[in-house]
Amino acid sequence: MNKKYLPSALILYLNYFIHGVGCSILGQAVIKEALAAAWGVEAMAITAISAALGLGRLIALPFAGPLSDKLGRRISTAIGSASYAIYLIGLALAFNAGTHGGYTIAYVCAIIGGIANSFLDTGIYPAVSEIIYKAPSVATMGIKFFIAIAQMLLPFVLGVAVTSTAAGFTSYNPLFYGCGIAYIVLFVLVFLFPLPDADQKASGKKEGLIDSLKHTHFSFESIAMILIGFTCTGTFQLLSLIHISEPTRPY
């Protein structure tokens, strides 16, 4: 790995560190109860907000990848960071709105959060693989590592981030605002450090999207891996939603 890309790799991984918090927030029982109380809905209704994340991801997937190839990893990552900031800060604003449209605001922001997820995936996965080109599998494992660390630390952070409003509601807005501001900082930083694909474009060595597609070959093993990834992720999300909606049900 070229050492000049080391700060860039750290910035990309930090996006997924905050993502580890963002994608897990709505699955935390205490946050779910706090949001439900503020919006005047049943706790189970928060499941629909979680599902909106998946909806947003599905909406963006068809064009996020081609845009990443055409516009570059930097732009794709920046779109993801900015969208995630909107999602997280939007959740805080939705909490403040309470029963005056708070639930609707949160649903729209969750869709934007899902779109952010798609752009981060299509920007950062190839970017870190291009940076750590001698060991791309290690590069992608690093993404999972940062997500796992964030999810492990989240329960401890919740104890620090909790506050109470004047109306007596439990609030986790400091966490929402903090993560949203972190994404704004990362949005700025991603433009300040070099990325391999941007350098290749500048030197005229970057292969075009059409040329890249011409050399694409899906082996039996690659198709099997795609199917495994889809079914494993889908099963995990399904079980998570069931657990969120029925936390006291024995398994």
State what each model feature region is.
Residues 1-3, 197-221:
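Juxtamembrane intracellular "pre-TM" segments in multi-pass secondary transporters
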